[in-house]
Amino acid sequence: MKALARLIVGLLILDAAVTAPTLESINYNSETYDATLEDLDHLYNYENIPMGRAEIEIATVMPSGNRELLTPPPQPEEAEEEEEEESTPRLIDGSSPQEPEFTGVLGPQTNEDFPTCLLCTCISTTVYCDDHELDAIPPLPKNTAYFYSRFNRIKKINKNDFASLNDLRRIDLTSNLISEIDEDAFRKLPQLRELVLRDNKIRQLPELPTTLRFIDISNNRLGRKGIKQEAFKDMYDLHHLYLTDNNLDHIPLPLPENLRALHLQNNNIMEMHEDTFCNVKNLTYIRKALEDIRLDGNPINLSKTPQAYMCLPRLPIGSLV
């Protein structure tokens, strides 16, 4: 048995020796093995390797093109929901914003088919139409609060020019050619605070709203019948009343208690009564608010009626001779 075992071992050793590779079959780079130690750094200098294409590090396995991603693709329903979320903007509370309503960004059309805010200048709730050679009030946006149309050629104010403008607070039509105003042109404006109509040709004032605080109708043609009786009586918030350079022959009475300034210079006022400003039945009455009265340029002698000023904090400005 020992002889048989030795025979088998010998055959295995012989087979291994026969199948072993010879030196001629080994391929190697002789230049590398013949290099000196000083040249080895040059052979393995990676800084000089061109970077024009991507390099693969040793022991790094590139994923094959057929390899499936670990994250499964979204289901059809989920994909539709994601698309809807991306296309529809959401508010903080998760609701969808309302579609904006466009009601004429440039305002209503004028008679020349131009939007008012293209012909004029609209800034927030203020409309400026100064010096545009307008001959009529243009249609105004509903939210207009302040309207300026100075230095134009407007001749008439119609009752519908400011209709339904419930937020209108100031109207300034200085230096036009206005000679006629419809009776209801201003009366139905619930928020009107300031009315400026100076430098026009107005002969008759229409009924005005009691909400007015500032009125300037200077340099017009108001005469004896130009202002209605008790026109300013119920204007409890009226502070300034300017009627200079007209043809008035009397002071329009009664005047509001809170009036601060009354300018009537350069009219035709010839007389004044003791109760024009004061209460003759109450000698202790003092009219504290009315500090600015201008009567200069009128044919009136203020010295003839001294009792008319006893309740005033300051004497009116005017002729004393």
UniProtKB/Swiss-Prot annotation:
Annotated LRRNT domain residues: 105-142
Disulfide bonds: C117-C129, C278-C311
Domain of life assignment: Eukaryota
Signal peptide: 1-19
Gene Ontology biological-process annotations: articular cartilage development; bone development; sensory perception of sound
Annotated PROSITE patterns: LRR (PS51450)
Cellular component GO terms held in the UniProt record: extracellular matrix; extracellular region
Cell compartment(s), UniProt: Secreted, Extracellular space, Extracellular matrix
SUPFAM superfamilies with a match to the protein in the record: L domain-like (SSF52058)
Biased composition (Acidic residues): 77-86
LRR repeats: from-to residues: 143-164, 167-188, 191-212, 237-257, 258-279, 289-309
Keywords: Disulfide bond, Extracellular matrix, Glycoprotein, Leucine-rich repeat, Proteoglycan, Repeat, Secreted, Signal
Tissue-wise expression: Preferentially expressed in the zone of flattened chondrocytes of the developing limb cartilage.
Family: Belongs to the small leucine-rich proteoglycan (SLRP) family. SLRP class III subfamily.
Protein name per Swiss-Prot or TrEMBL: Epiphycan
Gene: EPYC
